[in-house]
Structure formats: structure tokens, C-alpha cells
């Protein structure tokens, strides 16, 4: 509750649960509060990796506009666009300023960072790169860095992508001289884009970026993405009583939760899934008024909100038109 006000009790489960489930529910609730901007008490509670988890940063991400394969092939032929591999991680902002490393999620809220990654960021600072901001995908044990927003205290957001990427080239050269290149990886520009090859070899997709496109918040026609399979954020409705699977649902235009089938809960999931969790699933297509076809669990999304689990994000199977 609010500091200085009375605490409020709220029953989280209708019946007793195991310690494992209770711990998972606690962690989920804690992350939701931090995601919404709450911080811990000054009386001594701390957060692993950062003392201000959940605090708002100045990160406002440039998001990719989805396109189909026809549009992608047009962009491949357009000399005003370049391409990069799209990696399936979690959006991560990295800033180094005044000797401090800050990480933020897609919502712009500060999150913890792994010690190994912090050391790699500090290595760059020791090589003479100061006051920089990187835009990355967090792959768990390493980062895929695809853009740079500032360096040496100079804001690059108003520069074109090609000019920004030149600064990443200098960083890549420094990283190659050490083991830190395996932790902070630079997403290269593709000189040739073979969609069939990328699809056949299991890549998530490809991004297209206008060479003179500035870095802006939100989506525009300067950055596109083509994904080789569909991805959706859904909410866990319930767990199956006897199988390792969960029922999943999305929010429709009437603000009602609608079931879209079940997905298997893998054995290596970071923690047991519980009702109310937001997760990403991959699928081939969705049936109108039905379920997702061949969904597979991708990852837990503690960085998103329920308003991100919308039915409007689903890609539905095309149906034959009546003659």
C-alpha cells in the first residue's frame, strides 16, 4: 500500500497452495508493482541488481512496424533501407553515465542487470567510450545490440540510422579485442537478404531500417519487421489439473477475456506458471472465434501489462470467399 497509509489485506488464492506456487505468486505481484513504478521502502529493502527497480528512465523505444513478405521484398530492393536479423529476446535499454550502468525495459522502467553484462559495459567505458546509451535485445546471458542513442554525451537520436550505426562499429572493434564481445554483441547489417534461407534456418525474422531515419518513440515508416512465425502476448487463465499445460486467453474489443486454447508448459520454464501470468507464445495462425494453431511457449512477460494481451494482435487464418 501507500507509504503513510493503512495496509490493506487482499486474498490472492481461494484455497491453500504449495510454497512453490506461493513464492511464484509473490514474485509476480512484486514485479507488477515495480513495473507500475513502485519502489521499496527506504527502511532497508533492496532489489537485486539495482537500487531503483521500477523507476522511470528516459528510454522511449522506437518500435518496428510489421510488414508482409511482399513489402519485405520491396524493402530489400530499396537502396534507402538496410536490414538486420531480428532476435527473439526482451527489449533492453542500457545506459552508462557518471560511472553508473542503468538497464530499462520496453516500458522505460529500470530493471536489474546481470553482473557479467555490467562488467562488459564498464569495459567499454574503460576503453574510452563515455556516457552512452544502447538499444538491445536481452537474450538472457548476453545482449544483441542493434542501435545506439548517444555516445560521449552526444545525443544521436536526430541522426540517421546509418550514421548511428557507424558509432556501433567503433564499439564492436573494441569488443573484439576481449571476451566481452560474447556478452555485448553487435547486430550486423546484412549485405544480402535471403528470406528463404533465414526462414529455413530458424531465424525469428528480419528488420528493415531507413538509412536516414531518425530514432523516434513509437512506430513509423522508417523501421519494419518481417517475422517468420507469429507471436502473441496472452494471459494464463488456468493450469490443467493433470497435464503440463495452461489455458490461455486474450482481451477482446469489449474488454472481455476470451479463451484461445492451451499451450504446453515446458519443463525448463523459469518458474511455474500461474493464473494471471502474461506470456508470449508462438503460433502459425489463429482461427476466427477459435484457438491458436500449434502454439508453443516462448517466454514469461513480466515487463508487460494486461492491456498488451489484446485479440487485435492475432493473425487469423484466411478463409475462402464464397462464390
Can you annotate each of these PLM segments?
Residues 25-32, 170-174, 201:
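Generic, well-ordered alpha-helical scaffold segments in large soluble proteins
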Residues 42-82:
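Conserved, charged/glycine-enriched, solvent-exposed linker/hinge segments
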Residues 53-59, 144, 150, 171-190:
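TOPRIM metal-binding catalytic domain and adjacent DNA-binding surface shared by DnaG-type primases
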Residues 65-108, 176-303, 323:
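Nucleic-acid 5′ end/cap handling module spanning
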Amino acid at each position: 500500500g501507500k507509504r503513510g497509509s493503512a495496509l490493506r489485506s487482499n486474498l490472492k488464492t481461494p484455497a491453500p497452495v504449495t510454497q512453490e506456487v506461493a513464492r511464484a505468486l509473490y514474485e509476480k505481484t512484486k514485479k507488477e508493482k515495480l513495473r507500475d513504478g513502485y519502489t521499496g521502502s527506504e527502511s532497508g529493502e533492496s532489489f537485486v541488481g539495482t537500487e531503483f527497480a521500477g523507476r522511470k528512465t528516459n528510454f522511449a523505444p522506437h518500435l518496428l512496424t510489421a510488414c508482409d513478405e511482399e513489402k519485405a521484398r520491396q524493402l530489400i530492393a530499396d537502396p534507402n533501407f538496410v536490414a538486420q536479423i531480428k532476435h527473439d529476446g526482451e527489449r533492453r535499454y542500457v545506459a552508462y553515465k557518471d560511472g553508473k550502468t542503468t538497464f530499462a525495459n520496453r516500458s522505460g522502467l529500470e530493471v536489474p542487470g546481470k553482473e557479467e553484462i555490467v562488467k562488459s559495459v564498464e569495459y567499454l567505458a574503460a576503453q574510452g567510450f563515455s556516457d552512452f546509451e544502447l538499444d538491445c535485445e536481452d537474450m538472457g546471458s548476453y545482449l544483441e545490440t542493434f542501435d545506439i542513442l548517444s555516445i560521449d554525451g552526444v545525443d544521436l537520436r536526430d541522426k540517421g540510422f546509418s550514421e548511428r550505426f557507424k558509432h556501433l562499429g567503433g564499439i564492436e572493434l573494441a569488443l573484439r579485442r576481449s571476451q566481452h564481445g560474447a556478452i555485448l554483441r553487435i547486430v550486423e547489417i546484412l549485405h544480402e537478404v535471403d528470406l528463404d534461407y533465414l526462414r529455413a534456418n530458424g531465424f525469428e525474422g528480419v528488420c528493415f531500417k531507413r538509412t536516414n531515419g531518425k530514432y523516434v518513440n513509437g512506430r513509423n515508416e522508417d523501421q519494419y519487421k518481417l517475422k517468420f512465425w507469429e507471436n502473441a502476448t496472452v494471459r494464463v487463465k488456468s493450469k490443467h489439473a493433470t497435464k503440463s499445460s495452461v489455458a490461455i486467453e486474450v482481451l477482446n474489443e469489449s474488454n472481455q477475456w476470451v479463451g484461445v486454447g492451451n499451450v504446453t508448459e515446458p519443463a525448463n520454464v523459469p518458474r511455474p506458471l500461474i493464473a494471471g501470468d502474461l506470456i508470449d507464445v508462438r503460433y502459425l495462425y489463429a482461427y476466427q472465434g477459435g484457438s491458436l494453431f500449434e502454439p508453443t511457449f516462448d517466454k514469461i512477460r513480466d515487463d508487460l501489462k494486461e492491456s498488451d494481451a489484446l485479440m487485435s494482435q492475432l493473425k487469423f487464418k484466411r478463409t475462402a470467399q464464397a462464390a
